[in-house]
């Protein structure tokens, strides 16, 4: 009798289940979307990812974008990197921004909402110069 786990993958008694399926306590199939990105030993990286992103929403967005497998690997690599950085440096930061804003819910405000008032402010040339009484006279030696 051989040992076989819930994933159906028998690897000499070791069940080769990805960190995503392990976290969600579901069967990990050979065609699992997260298997190449989160093998069993990268459980902490999956938890970092899972804090920021929804699994199903991410899968849907990547499919909607129609990325090639290479582009998909690049995107997932960036998302995983961002998640790991965010776990090390939590909280809002200029240095750490959400790389893939397409994965954000629509209710979140755009960064342009913060920049637009600055862009629309009057140019410096429209500000009148200070009164002559405040400017010291130039002296030549």
Swiss-Prot record:
Domain LOB: start-end pairs: 16-119
Highest rank taxon of the organism: Eukaryota
Q: Which InterPro entries match?
A: LOB
- Pfam assignment, any one: LOB
| Family the entry assigns | Belongs to the LOB domain-containing protein family.
List the protein's name: LOB domain-containing protein 34
